Amino acid sequence: MKAVELKRLLDSMARLTMGQKADVLEALQAGGDDEEVRSIAESRLIQTPACPHCKGGWIVRNGSASGLQRYKCRVCQRTFNTLTATPLARLRMKAKWLQQQDVLSQGLSVNKAAAALDVAPTTSFRWRHRFLQLAQAVKANDLNGVVEADETFFLRSSKGQRPGRKPRKRGGRASREERGMDLMPILVVRDRSGATADFLLEAVSKACLSQALKARIHSDAILCTDGSAAMAAAAHELHLHHEPLNLSAGERVRGPWHIQNVNAYHSRLKSWIARFHGVATSYLENYLGWFRALDRAAKNQQKSAPMLALALGLAGHH
């Protein structure tokens, strides 16, 4: 815009009503958010300049579309943009993605998020799970020092499905006859620095526990548990230094050994997830990843969790 045109525009601002000024500010904010989203998205190819189709590294600019730079791979001759092969591919309204990051950081319900974003509830739900698709895999690796491990349980939910059983009343409990089938075990592993990993288990067995723990805990770590037979067997199989507590005898703490950190994490997780009034088991891993992202942000004193970066695969494992 030329200087004369800009001056004319600024002079006209004085004649705007308060409502019109608010509309102008909203438009300016949306433009700034759209530019920031594009900048974050484009940083993917700066970090890893590779074709999403063939992984070739010989790529060139090839015009633009929908406000995003397009590229062409000289190896496979296919075109793409920086969102191709990410969970956010083909999602519209990029100017609202930073707001979506904020509503995820606040843990808003689908309807409250839809109202905040001025979108339909179906759009809010779809955006939530697109943003969380990669977050579920971001877990701590190589936990070390004193590592606490314990299971907690969530009621299985077939929300949105037609299970082959009589439906429970909302907020129901597992039946005594089918208690083992109705409860989903979640193993949470957390070291004293706050690094956390969690796993949905098929069963609380040596095989399932060993499979979950073997790639996450450093060989020199000290594993502290509630002393269950399955956990003791898994620790023995993985050759880990194991410090079990005898909870049945009332032993909660023995010197530096306890599982209070991981149990406190269980409590915060269940309290937070209760706001959603029942999470379908098919989506539970997304919510676990969401809560881990919020927990990391709180630990690092971040104003909001980097949910957009997580959705694009830009955030590292913590």
Regions found by a protein language model. Name each.
Residues 1-318:
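Residue-level recognition of single "structural anchor" positions
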